[in-house]
């Protein structure tokens, strides 16, 4: 046993169905970090950070790269669309971020997302007819499928022997064309583009497993891992089949970076003051009335990646307790409380009941049919008319808003350390809990 091990890694994870505002907490914590990492997912993720009057949208890059002093690492668990990556780098540079390419390291073990994966994603969704999963059509699922069927190509293949890469790429094309005869792929054109990306990757690719584990040995190094998507979209623990294709919970951090669990010091969960989800799937607290419409408009609830309108529901502590069982959060960040300003009353889901037996469910149901039928038991609290927007101190909040926060804490038995009160990076309350 290594008794001198440093628990220098902090992790930020979503505890709902994504879009919780993880970027805001990552932006804050990255100020005291030396390294920021992505561990899973691809450019189906979407993190938004507002800083210096500019709005930054991140899909593949760790959003903590906004801090000019950090090293950013894309870990082995991420699937990388190179066209999207370089486009994102250019957009970040054009908005004034410094030395983005020179501060970025990409794992040589990352699997690659090709246009053929995106086409397969689109075709598969069309084949589902009315039973849509709500995929982002970014090719993420098919890329992970290639990884699991062991015919995927990795960054190390692309930067290695070109003839070998060409042969492997053609094998992959032949494999998918046998299954999708309608798929049109210009192999030579694709290879020419990939050769360009191969040159552009120069200096960025590394053995990220070795790099990260060496970095954890230093007491001066503070590593921040930002999860993409969220626990309820986890391929194993989410509301399957309406999930993403990777592990978005704490296990995905370790496997997606080659990091021992013993290196992880703190795990922080991020929740909204209400709940949202994009695409299909059961949603027990969903609001299909004027209140839902009010929250949707006021919260500007549109997907960063998909541009689709997000579905709206009340805060669901059953979901968050389940996420806590899996991830063991040290503390929570509660975002967008300002969106609830002006409501006559606010509700918090505290339990699910089986509609046939009338019994409270003892665990979060794996079966989506059961989840779609549950009766939700709510705590109903008075709303508040006074604005919480841009509050910086807890005691500045209206009494009813504080009651809401403290009720959530009591129901979850997890401290809420951060409270988001607006879009700006400075619109946050930090509590000593």
Curated annotation (Swiss-Prot):
One of its GO terms (biological process) is 'de novo' AMP biosynthetic process. Keywords: Cytoplasm, GTP-binding, Ligase, Magnesium, Metal-binding, Nucleotide-binding, Purine biosynthesis. The keyword Magnesium applies. One of its GO terms (molecular function) is GTP binding. Mg(2+) binds at residues 19, 46. Binds 1 Mg(2+) ion per subunit. It holds the Pfam family Adenylsucc_synt. It is found in: Cytoplasm. Its EC number is 6.3.4.4. This is Adenylosuccinate synthetase.
